From Swiss-Prot:
Record-linked CDD domains: RPS2
Source lineage: Bacteria, Pseudomonadati, Pseudomonadota, Alphaproteobacteria, Rhodobacterales
Protein name, per record: Small ribosomal subunit protein uS2
Xref: HAMAP family: Ribosomal_uS2_B
GO biological processes: translation
Gene: rpsB
């Protein structure tokens, strides 16, 4: 079954600044094969390699979701936080954008207990808070906000993910180490100052520019949605029909 895949062009990558690496002095020799050259002391990524590698990464994302797999989007640096969360939410997947919690993958049991605590707090504060003192309620709200910030994006994950998508492997080295330990494949954007070690599907490119980050996130999110429609298509569900169904129900009520 030939499934759709989000399309992108070399020109889009150029316009988003995907080819701009870091200062040549900060380079990591392990990325040498993906570097085209340098311009004014900045390494330029070889986009003729990025294009097929990005395409390969998107296929893996799509196929993982088509098989019913879960994807965890990870990007905790300031400029990645919002696009990572939005992209994951758009395709009903999961994200971590606050800071990587050690043990998120390797100690899922403990993490899922914290998620349960968050759900209990939500429930309590929504319904059963009448008998609480102001101080108790305040403490609960504080705990809820803290848990929501770090776990909100994975509260519905329900287990370790089947694939991880990462922006900035230098910053997210802990996530990569945990994924490697569990044999979870990693798709990641790797800039010229980082090592691609531990990354199964490398996307060589700029990991700092807002436009580049937005482009990767959008493409990965769309690939996941393509996988979802393939999965539903295989199950005989018509996505077009899903859009109208809820309105009919409200009419009856």
């Amino acid at each position: 079954m030939d499934m759709a895949l989000p399309e992108f062009s070399m020109r889009q990558l150029l316009e988003a600044g995907v080819h701009y690496g870091h200062q040549t002095a900060r380079w990591n020799p392990k990325m040498a094969e993906f570097i085209y050259g340098d311009r004014n002391g900045i390494h330029i990524v070889d986009l003729t390699q990025t294009v097929p590698m990005l395409d390969q990464a998107l296929k893996v994302v799509r196929d993982t979701v088509a098989k019913g797999g879960r994807i965890l989007f990870v990007g905790t640096k300031r400029q990645a936080q919002k696009p990572i969360a939005e992209a994951a939410e758009k395709c009903a997947q999961h994200y971590m954008n606050h800071r990587w919690l050690g043990g998120t993958l390797t100690n899922w049991k403990t993490v899922s207990q914290s998620i349960q605590r968050l759900k209990n707090l939500d429930e309590l504060l929504a319904h059963g808070a009448e008998g609480l003192t102001k101080k108790e309620r305040l403490n609960m709200e504080r705990e809820q906000q803290k848990l929501q910030a770090s776990l909100g994006g994975i509260r519905e994950m329900g287990g370790t993910p089947d694939l991880i998508f990462i922006i900035d492997v230098g910053k997210e080295d802990l996530a990569i180490a945990e994924a490697q330990k569990l044999g979870i494949p990693v798709v990641a954007v790797v800039d010229t100052n980082n090592s691609p070690k531990g990354v199964d599907y490398i996307i060589p490119g700029n990991d700092d520019a807002a436009r580049a980050i937005a482009l990767y996130c959008d493409l990965v999110s769309r690939a996941a949605l393509d996988g979802m429609s393939a999965q539903m298509g295989a199950a005989g569900i018509d996505l077009g029909a899903l859009d109208v169904a809820p309105e009919e129900e409200t009419l009856e009520a």
